[in-house]
Each structure stands twice: as C-alpha cells, then as structure tokens.
C-alpha cells in the first residue's frame, strides 16, 4: 500500500466525491453561524444543520467537505494519552434528499480500497442490528462475507438526538494487526484495544423520532458521513498514534527541537510534548477564525489552550516566547488545505505573541505564590486550596482557575470552586463601587461603605423623566451627613430615581433635584454597591436633609440624544454581523449624547465598501421607523427568543429584551428611543483597530450628523473660495490646478536641464586623468539630486570611460553623486566607496553600487575638500 500524507489524503477524498457529483465546499469557520447550541464547531455535520433541518436550501443536494473541528470535553486527557486531541479535521460527504445507502456504502468501499489502497481483507463493516437493507448491500453488492459484517445495538450504530431526524449507522473498521492488539486471541471489532480502529461512519437519516420511541419514515432521506482525517492517516501511514502522522510529527519534532528533548524517552516530557503539539494546532486555527483570547466563551477556550501550552513549554525547559514560532510550522503544514492560514499569518502570530507575553509577565510570580500555598496545605494537613487563595492567583497573577486546578491535581490537591466564585463576586462589587467613586472628584470609597446595607434605590426612569422620592442618604466628599447646604459638593441617594447611572457603556443622566426652596445640580449618576444609585453634584440653592421629599428631573434633551445613540449601537452590531459575519461580537461600547463608540471582534480593517454597506443597512432600518419594543422575561425565555447576550455577563432572574422589528433583538438594560425613526440618520466617522482582533467604530446620529455635514459644507465653501471657484466646480478646479502644477514642474525641469547643459561646458574643462582613467570631480550650482543624475549621464556620454563626482549645495543641504563606467570599474573604480570617503567631509554619509552612488550632507563649506579628495581616493582604487 502506498503511503499518503495528510494533505494528499484530504485532496484525494474531496476530489473523489467531487467526481461523484458532489459540490466541494471549503471548511466552515470554527465559530458557529447562527447556532447558539454550540460554542465551537465540533463535527463535520454541525455547520450543515440548516440544510438537514430544511431551514435553508443547500447549494447542491450533494456536498463534500473537510471540516476543521474543536472538542475540549476531554481536555484533561490531552497529552496524558496519545489518543486524544482537541483539534481534528472531519471528512464528510452529504446527501440532502438525493442518494442513500447503496451509493454511500459503495463509494465508501471504493474510496478506501481503490483510491487509498487499503486491503479489503482488513476492513470490517458494522451495521445496526435491525438494518437488513444495509446488511444486504454489504453482503450482496460489495461482497463482504456475512461473518465479517457486525450487527450492533442502538448505542453503537443508531444516531439519535432526542426528537427529530435520526437513523441507523454503518461503520467501517480497519484491522491494524496483532502488534496493536490486546493479546486476546478472540480480539475483534468492538474491542477497546487499538487493533480494530473505526475509520468511516455512514449515518442513514431515514426516520423522524417523536422522542417517545416512535419512528416515522422520512420522505426525504439524508446521508451524513464522517471520517476523521487524522485517524485515516494513522491507518494509511501505519503509525502508532495521531502524534506520529506526518503533519503532527513535524510539529512534534519542532517542539522537541525547541526543548532539546527526545520523544518517547521520558513519559513526563512526552505528555508535555503531545499537549503542546495538539494545543498549538487549536490555537492557530481558532485565532485564524477571528477568536481572540478573553475570559469569556470561545475566547476563554482559546486562552486556556494557549496558556496550558505555554506552561508545558516551561516544564520542558523552553525559555521565553515560543508559541508564535511553533505556529509557523502549523501554518506551513496546513496551508495547502487552509490557505487562509498563510493569509492571516501575521495576525495569528501577533495574537499568540501578545497573549504569551501577558502570561509570561505573571506566571513566574504566580507559580512561586502557588508553591507557597502548596507548602501551607501540606503543613496544615489539608488537600483543598480555599477559594480566596485560588481567586488571588486568578485576580493578581492572571492564573485561570482551570490552570491552578490542573497544577494542583498533578500533585494530589483540589480547589474550593464555590469559594472561588464567591470571592469573584465580592471583587466585582468592590470594583464597581471603586470605579464609580473614582469618577467623582476622587472621593474615598469608605464614604459609601458606611451606608446602611439595607438602603437601596429603585430605578423608575424607563417610562418617566421626573419623579418624587425621599432622600435616604446624604454624603459630602468626606463624610455621611444629615444635611448639605449651598455651595457644597455632595452625593444624594433616594428611594426611587428616574436617573440612569453609568452602566453597560451608556453614560449617566444629568439634571436637577428640587426640594423646598432648594436646588441641586446633578452632574453625574453612579451605580453603587447594593443596588444604590448616587446622584453626584452641587447644592446651588438652599439645603437638603435626610428624609425630605424631593423631585428629581432628568435633562430630557440629553436622555433623548443618548437613547438615539444607544439604539443605533444595536442596529450597528446587527449590521456588522450581517456584513462581516457572525464572528462579530461586542467587545465594548461607550454611548454619550454626542456620539457612540462600538468595539467589536474582527480580524481586519473594514473596506470602504463594507463601511458603506453597514452604514446603509443601519439607515435603512432607521427609515423603516419600526417601534423599539422592550419586554421583560426570564433569561431562558430571552435566549429561546433569539436575543443576543454578552458572553460571561451575569443576568438576574428577569431581563429586558430590546427588539427593533425583525432586525435586532438584544438583552439590554439601557434606555432607548420609542421607534427607530427617532434616530433620524446614522453616520460612521471612523473605523480603526484598537487591539489584536478588536476594531472600533465611532459614529454620530440625528442632529450631530446635520452639524457634521454643515461643518463639512462650510469647509467646502472655504476651499472653493481659496481655489477661486464655486463648490460645484471645485473638483474640476482642483484637476485644472493639478495640470497647471504639472506643467509648471515640467517647465522647471526643462530650465534645470538647460542650466545643467550650460554647466556642461564649464565642468568639461575640469577633467583630469588618474592612472589612465578620466576623472571629473566638480561643483555644480542650482541642481538637486535628480539634476545631478541627469548631468552625470550626459557627462558619461561625452567622456566615455570615466569616473564622475558631482556636488551641489542648496542653503544648508549638500547633494553628492558618483558614477563609474564599466571600463573604469574594470580597473578598480568603485562609486560607492568613493562616495563613502568624501561624504564625511560635507557632514554626511552614503554609499551605493560600484557604478552609481549618492549621499547627502549638511556642511556646504566642505564641498571643495570633498572634490579635492576625489583624486586621491580614485588613485588608490585604480590598480
């Protein structure tokens, strides 16, 4: 049997099924598209679910793919055994109501035996025990003896996932030989050893299950085939494990080289070598698909894999950053099948480098602290690290909980995970209040810590702009107090408030609080610990006391402007996902009354066309003037409704879902307009990158857009005035001025050439002969570098074989150029070396080729000395 590489096998498979009428599709992204049931694509069928369910019409009834997949369910076993991996490629051929069992079985056999060249005697099919149709196809059509066809039960050979389409499977096993067996003479298909390995699985989707054991025959039957590319390579290449196939071995060998280690010598090192080899594939492909390291969702999976690999690199003794360098091998080995890896290489390496740098800055100190904690556990006779200590490692030293857990488990310890969660919650509350306080005149957090925990504030501002309530707390900048008077800066807390505190990227309301003969200007509104809302500002009239009833009124004009910009961010996010893809996720936002800022995950700058599409899409939704509807529901109901939520965000029992027609639906606690038409118009001002894989858009809406265009119009009129034309004719006027400038520059060049020609006769008299070679070293007036070059070319034509050095000065700038003909160079002349020696005399430097070189300087007074020195330099050069 011929041995094929992974890249060859991938191509052979796709080409084979393309020859059978299948549409060959590129691998889908690891980021699921419109599938909230998956964090990452984990099978070949996963991206095609809409075609199987009928939600979407497939591009063709026959499709074949090689799908990149990530599975981290058994991440703890990666490296410990040679069987497990997080990244794999799944080969698949699919039929959507077209061919069925006969073709699927026949083609699987044909590919394995005739294309790949596996021996039919070593292949064993399995079928669902009641699937007589599949048995007859294998037996009568393919020619497999009955005793070599294995009937198995539902657990092994029937694909079913709750209610819905389902069906029997037919797998194909390959006998790798006794050397991979368990030693049992009765070892056969189904044994847990490594001898009989499943290489192919045909799923025959022919029933619809009601979930209660009742099955109805489907009118349109489907084929879902899966074959692990790496597993096929293990069989074809006859190697022990997936870490020995050609592409994996290349990565494994690179790891060994970096660590100066040999594989299969030290079991502990082998574990780290395998783990790094696997994880670097995952992080390379995940980063390529726009996932960036973070503390939530897919980003957390990436960060966890990357940091595990980095730590095991240290265990192997690899010094400094190494993951980006190792990723180059992954890209080199996989770019045939995934050319986007090469296209995004610079981006991938940058993301990996930045993340590894972050980790390296904290890991040494963190490991030292963890070691001290381990010693304390031993001395205290306990096996469990408390949650506060685990959180300290996470919060201070950047150790993910999983990493701390993994390190401790290696040494027989565990972690109090509930205690960790409680410590994190405490930190979040503290951070919120600290941030809020810092935003207000540097007030001390202890002021707010002294407030009775039983005191709360209720926000009532969704449907009102003014409200009457009772003062529950008053503070100055330094103390809790019962009264504040005119001129004092203070914080007022009431039972109920229409003022929105800064949260979720939306800036706070401002306004006034009015009491009996008293006024307070609210300059900021902050969220405090315990759900309290602080109104920060200045007493402008009278005094306020705790217990008094006051009227709170927000600045409605500012609230409306904020609402327009906030609603626009929802439309913007949806438009970005529609135009760029569902990998786009919110990475931050900032909404004020003047403008909005939206940060999102994306791996490249937006083109002008993409920006225009996004802007047009948002304005189209604004023009529809659909109601902005807010519903309060449970988190589960919100998710079922398809509302977008931020990864990792904590929500209460009930949430607010903001819906804008059939275009946008998001979980959001902010304030919005009543209908999209109120936004009036939307304009993107800028788009730029702010971090690896994160872009930022700044935009304006409503009156700000009109002001923007008004300003632009004024600038246009001013420009037209300067150009002495009308705005409508400005483009033509600029084009005309450009032509005039071009003509003037051309005339200028002609004049320079004329001056150079006039200089030609003057300098010809300065030619000297040095060891049989003509040398012309001269000063020229009113010539730039281009003029010197043109003059030099003309002199060469007149002089024949020669060496030329020309110098020109303009104010405090000197230009030098040297030239040598072929004949002069044959005798040893070198223009570059000539320039190098004389340029120092004019306060400059330079060099170049033997035939031509140039330099600049800042000392015109040295020109004469430079010209004089040329003779001795050339004299030394000529042989």
Swiss-Prot record:
Its main location: cytoplasm. Binds 1 zinc ion per subunit. Zn(2+) binds at residues 566, 570, 668, 672. PROSITE patterns: AA_TRNA_LIGASE_II_ALA. It catalyses: tRNA(Ala) + L-alanine + ATP = L-alanyl-tRNA(Ala) + AMP + diphosphate. GO terms for biological process: alanyl-tRNA aminoacylation. Its cofactor is Zn(2+). It is found in: Cytoplasm. It comes from the Bacteria. Its EC number is 6.1.1.7. The keyword Cell membrane does not apply. Keywords: Aminoacyl-tRNA synthetase, ATP-binding, Cytoplasm, Ligase, Metal-binding, Nucleotide-binding, Protein biosynthesis, RNA-binding, tRNA-binding, Zinc. Pfam families: DHHA1, tRNA-synt_2c, tRNA_SAD. Belongs to the class-II aminoacyl-tRNA synthetase family. Catalyzes the attachment of alanine to tRNA(Ala) in a two-step reaction: alanine is first activated by ATP to form Ala-AMP and then transferred to the acceptor end of tRNA(Ala). Also edits incorrectly charged Ser-tRNA(Ala) and Gly-tRNA(Ala) via its editing domain. Consists of three domains; the N-terminal catalytic domain, the editing domain and the C-terminal C-Ala domain. The editing domain removes incorrectly charged amino acids, while the C-Ala domain, along with tRNA(Ala), serves as a bridge to cooperatively bring together the editing and aminoacylation centers thus stimulating deacylation of misacylated tRNAs. This is Alanine--tRNA ligase 1. It comes from Lachnoclostridium phytofermentans (strain ATCC 700394 / DSM 18823 / ISDg) (Clostridium phytofermentans).
């Amino acid at each position: 049997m011929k041995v094929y590489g992974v890249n060859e096998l991938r191509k052979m498979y796709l080409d084979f099924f393309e020859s059978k009428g299948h549409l060959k599709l590129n691998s889908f992204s690891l980021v699921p598209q419109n599938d909230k049931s998956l964090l990452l694509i984990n099978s070949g069928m996963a991206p095609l679910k809409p075609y199987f369910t009928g939600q979407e019409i497939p591009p063709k009834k026959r499709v074949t793919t090689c799908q990149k997949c990530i599975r981290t369910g058994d991440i703890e076993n990666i490296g410990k055994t040679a069987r497990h991996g997080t990244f794999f490629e799944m080969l698949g051929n699919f039929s959507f109501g077209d061919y069925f069992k006969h073709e699927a079985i026949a083609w699987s056999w044909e590919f394995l035996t005739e294309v790949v060249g596996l021996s039919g005697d070593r292949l064993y099919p399995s079928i669902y025990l009641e699937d007589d149709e599949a048995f007859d196809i294998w037996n009568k059509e393919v020619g497999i003896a009955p005793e070599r066809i294995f009937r198995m039960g539902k657990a092994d050979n029937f694909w079913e996932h709750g209610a819905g389409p389902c069906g029997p499977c037919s797998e194909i096993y390959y006998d790798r030989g006794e050397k991979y067996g368990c030693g049992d003479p009765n070892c056969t298909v189904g044994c847990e050893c490594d001898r009989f390995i499943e290489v192919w699985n045909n799923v025959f989707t022919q029933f619809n299950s009601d979930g209660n054991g009742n099955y109805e025959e489907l009118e349109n039957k489907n084929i879902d085939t899966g074959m692990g590319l790496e597993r096929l390579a293990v069989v074809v290449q006859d190697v022990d494990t997936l870490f020995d196939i050609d592409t994996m071995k290349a990565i494994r060998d690179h790891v060994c080289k970096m660590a100066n280690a040999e594989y299969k010598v030290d079991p502990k090192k082998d574990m780290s070598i395998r783990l790094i080899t696997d994880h670097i594939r995952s992080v390379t492909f995940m980063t390529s698909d726009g996932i960036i390291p973070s503390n939530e969702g897919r980003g957390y999976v990436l960060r966890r894999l990357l940091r595990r690999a980095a730590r095991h690199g240290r265990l192997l003794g690899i010094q400094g950053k190494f993951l980006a360098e190792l990723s180059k091998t992954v890209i080199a080995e996989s770019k045939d099948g995934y050319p986007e890896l090469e296209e995004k290489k610079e981006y991938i390496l940058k993301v990996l480098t930045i993340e590894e740098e972050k980790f390296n800055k904290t890991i040494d100190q963190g490991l030292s602290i963890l070691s001290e904690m381990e010693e304390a556990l031993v001395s205290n006779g306990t096996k469990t690290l408390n949650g506060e200590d685990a959180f300290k490692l996470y919060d201070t030293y950047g150790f993910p909980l999983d990493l701390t857990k993994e390190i401790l488990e290696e040494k027989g310890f565990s972690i109090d995970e509930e205690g960790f969660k409680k410590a994190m919650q405490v930190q979040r509350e503290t951070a919120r209040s600290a941030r809020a306080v810092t935003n207000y005149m540097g007030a001390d957090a202890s002021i707010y810590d002294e407030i009775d925990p039983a005191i709360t504030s209720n926000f009532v501002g969704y449907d009102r702009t003014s409200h009457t309530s009772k003062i529950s707390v008053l503070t100055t900048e330094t103390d809790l107090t019962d009264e504040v008077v005119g001129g004092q800066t203070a914080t007022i807390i009431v039972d109920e408030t229409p003022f929105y505190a800064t949260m979720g990227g939306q800036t706070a309301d401002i306004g006034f609080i009015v009491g009996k003969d008293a006024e307070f200007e609210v300059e900021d509104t902050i969220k405090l610990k315990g759900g309290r809302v602080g109104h920060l500002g200045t007493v402008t009239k009278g005094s306020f006391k705790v217990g008094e009833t006051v009227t709170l009124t927000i600045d409605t004009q500012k609230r409306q402007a904020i609402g327009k910009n906030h609603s626009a961010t929802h439309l913007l996010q949806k438009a970005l996902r529609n135009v760029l893809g569902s990998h786009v996720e919110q990475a931050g936002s900032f909404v004020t009354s003047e403008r909005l800022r939206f940060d999102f995950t994306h791996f490249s700058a937006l083109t002008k066309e993409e920006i225009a599409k996004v802007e047009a899409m948002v304005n189209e939704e604004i023009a529809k003037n659909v109601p902005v509807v807010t519903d309060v529901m449970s988190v589960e109901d919100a998710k079922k409704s398809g509302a977008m939520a931020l990864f990792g965000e904590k929500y209460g029992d009930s949430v607010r879902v903001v819906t804008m027609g059939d275009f946008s639906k998001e979980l959001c606690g902010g304030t919005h307009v009543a209908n999209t038409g109120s936004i009036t118009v939307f304009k993107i001002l800028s788009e730029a990158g702010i971090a690896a894989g994160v872009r930022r858009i700044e935009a304006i809406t409503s009156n700000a857009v009109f002001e923007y265009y008004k300003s632009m119009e004024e600038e246009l009129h001013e420009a037209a005035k300067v150009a002495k034309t009308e705005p409508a004719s400005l483009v033509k006027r600029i084009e005309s001025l450009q032509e005039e400038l071009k003509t003037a520059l051309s005339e200028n060049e002609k004049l320079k050439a004329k001056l150079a020609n006039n200089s030609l006769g003057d300098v010809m008299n300065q030619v000297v002969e040095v060891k049989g070679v003509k040398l012309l070293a001269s000063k020229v007036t009113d010539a730039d570098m281009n003029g010197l070059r043109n003059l030099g070319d003309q002199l060469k034509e007149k002089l024949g074989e020669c060496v030329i050095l020309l110098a020109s000065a303009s104010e405090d700038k000197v230009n030098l150029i040297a030239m040598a003909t072929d004949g002069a160079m044959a005798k040893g002349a070198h223009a570059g070396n000539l320039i190098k020696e004389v340029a120092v005399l004019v306060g400059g430097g330079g060099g170049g080729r033997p035939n031509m070189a140039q330099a600049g300087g800042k000392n015109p007074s040295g020109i004469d000395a430079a010209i004089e020195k040329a003779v001795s330099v050339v004299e030394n050069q000529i042989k």
